[in-house]
Amino acid sequence: MARYRQPERLTRTISCSDDYVDLKPVNEQPSDKMDPNLGLIASMPKVDQEDRSDLQRRWRNLTKLKPGLSEVNELDNESTPAVLIFGGINTARPTDYLNSASMFLYHLDRNNWNFYGTMLEPRNYHAAAYFHGKVYLFGGYNPLHCIKGKMQATSTTFQLTLDVKQWRRRADMPSARAHHGVTIMDERIFVFGGKDSNGNIIASVEMYEPELDQWTSLASIPEPLMGSAVTNNEGLIYVVGGLTTKKEKNQEGVLSNKIYCFDPLNNKWYRKPPLPCPRAFASATTQNKKIWIWGGASLSEGGTLASTTSVDIWDPKKGRFEQHLIFDSPKHCLAVTKAGTQVFIIGGMSSKENSSLAEVQVYDRKRDILQKCAFLPVSLTGTAAVGIPVNRSPASDITTSKTTRSGSRKTQKTLKDKQQSDIHARNKAARTIQLNYRKYHASKQRRSGIPRDALRKKINVGEGDRVSGRIRTYITGYRPKAPGDDDLSKDFAPVTIPFWPPDPDTSDSVFHTVVDQFHCAKEKMQFKHFYTIPRQIDPNLGMLLFMDEDYQHSKKVLGLRNVESTPYYMSRFHATGDIQDTSIPVIIAIGGVDPQDPMNVSYGRSVFQYHPLKDRWEFFGFMSLPRNHHAAAYYRGAIYVTGGCDPHIRCWGEMVATKMTFVYRLSSNKWTRVADMHSARSHHSMVVFNDSIYVIGGRDDSGRLSASVESYVPALDEWNQEKPMPLPRMGMAVVSHGGYLWVMGGVTSTKGGNINPPVLDDVICYDPVFKHWVSGKPLRIARAFGSAVVCDDKIWLCGGAAPSQDENNYLVSIPAIDVYDNEALEWIQKATLSCPRHSSVVVALESCLYLIGGINSHELSAINRNELYTTDSDTVQSIRELPVQLTGMAAVTIPPTCVTFRSESLSIMIRHKVVT
């Protein structure tokens, strides 16, 4: 589990990264020229304890703030998001303490503000954060507590549980502060800088863990800052601009144009390219992995604060600024929050109006425009705002606590995977484990008295003895194993087979066994020879080999028949009658095989349905025949399944590819066999392009790799030959993008006795219109049996297997998610899966990528763990597991019968469901 490094508690000296020298806070306040209130609040009266108690008592029983403003007690956000603001101060009436204690609720569909009640204490220039159904308020000024006419910063933390509308005080911050910045990342809340109760600008950084109600001090900002804009982007936190102090004493505060970047995982600070001009008291948000800086204040010619109308966008990758929007009126100290597809800009100060503002503007991210909406009930500056998402689950505190702990464990695991993202180190560890296992297996054979060389010698076989079809290993003593008490759902337990999985035969385990193993589909062969696949390029890692004779012999001895029965896991499923949902897209997973139970053909016929918003797998039914390592595609109300291996058909201990094509039409709810392909194939790819379905490459029924490409026209029910690939390959990833069929990676055959692993890193593109192949940008690393999908007009390549560097060149699963940058024309690693996998399936649902099943070479088994990667937030989350460990599946996305939700709304709902 990744942990944040907890530094020593800092007092006076501010530590920073090696790029900066240590600074010390200066015990002087900025002059009035740098006052964010523009000097409008010169002095505040002192309120004694009795008056404070009386005010707070009256506020608790308050039902109406002013005439014409209704009070609500419910969020009423079942259909649209809501915006909730807390406190603030009116510069024209700063002693109206009720304004600083009030909460206002805005409904997007009604375009009006309502009074939502009062807080425990009045606050202004504080910070707020929404987290798992609760709102947290941090610090700020309390206008009821003043010393020498100045409001005092506080260190209190308040929690509002929205379900029951209940306030609770939580652990205080180590430092009192106001004008500070807050952001949420990785289930934690980070607080940066501010101004303390002594009037000093501070640089301290503190982290709050809501689950533990605990504060931790982190590495301080390289210089003291207040009024900075804070946001996070791709695992880093950015602190933009602000008001700081000079290192020399008796100097006024100055505006900063610096951008600091904080890495919470390593507890380090870095400097980024500065702002074009100094700016403070702005707000920042992250949209499309770019940082938006809203408003703020710069220096006028007279040296005072001047509000700005600019909304700038900063690209962290390119370090480039551009002005994107302009406000109607300049403003600073504004509150900015995101709610759904909109960004709300609320209140603030204006140097032009010389007063606080009641103006509220909304930025529509889809239409890229600024609009005005209902004004605040009162002009406010220094307020805090949060966006409340749609359909927030009304769970109890206990359920929320459990969900938070579960989400925390997932996030900590994701952090650990990001910290250990070195693929080569993982491959080295996997090779060490596998090498030790093989040594142990060889020593076990020596102890058993069977020399390794005896496997290649001719031996005498008795009448009742059997010989394995490929390795010629003398095997005896097969008998059924009695079922245990904990596994009564199966009639028969797996057969115990000594020395399984076996080591590859040295005479057949080199790559020259697949030299030129491809042919044209029209080629006439006088005899048919089956080429077994070397274990070094076998996606199943040898776990499915050499089972044919054992299975048939056990079946004959036991007198078994082919009986179609309901799988044992059916009792754990919710029944589903329709394969298509009315309002939400669903994922359909078809077939597959469990390497640890390869004789269970019910897995290959099973059809599962996954509902994204329910995060639940349901058993839909069976397809006509069992299949694994096949391909599927959805086209105009029908699911097409091509090729794949049939567990009933084996040759030399391996399942054989088929050429059959099945279609499931949603209108008739029936499986139908249509025209067969010209070539049998498995481990191939299938994609839809311009009213045709294309199948590419794979391994044919003779065990040879294929370079053929075929296209199927559903309207004519016929297959046509296309121009073959330059090289035969299987296990490649294929997508349709930009008018081309992109073929990425895969495994090819070797020539001339070359022992290098035949895993490819090249990318070739096929033009179906002009019938020619062109070369693309090679992959970042060579990989095979990966999965690719197009999402947000980009190609995403997930998982796969890379060749190892030992003498046997075994395949090793990798956890990388790569994306093709259309501008830079290169492949970039974007994320790391928590579980390395290959031979898995990936489907795209709006901005969400679902990775299902596959094989993990580190565990030497198939996996049932599934993961969700969101492209817009760049996060990896675990989702509901499959009922069994499966690999070689195929999956498609079925659209709803009626489109109800917008794509972005659906993505937000999915992320909210997974996190909560």
Swiss-Prot record:
TM segment ranges: none
Keyword terms of this UniProt record: Kelch repeat, Repeat
Domain of life: Eukaryota
Record keyword Repeat present: yes
Span list, region Disordered: 393-426
Tissue: Sperm.
Biased composition regions of type Basic and acidic residues, renumbered to the chain: 414-425
Sequence ranges of the Kelch repeats: 82-133, 134-187, 188-235, 237-289, 291-341, 342-390, 586-637, 638-691, 692-739, 741-793, 795-847, 849-896
A Pfam family matched in the record: Kelch_KLHDC2_KLHL20_DRC7
Task performed by this protein: May have an enzymatic role. Found the acrosomal vesicle at the anterior of sperm but not in the acrosomal process.
Annotated protein name in UniProt: Beta-scruin
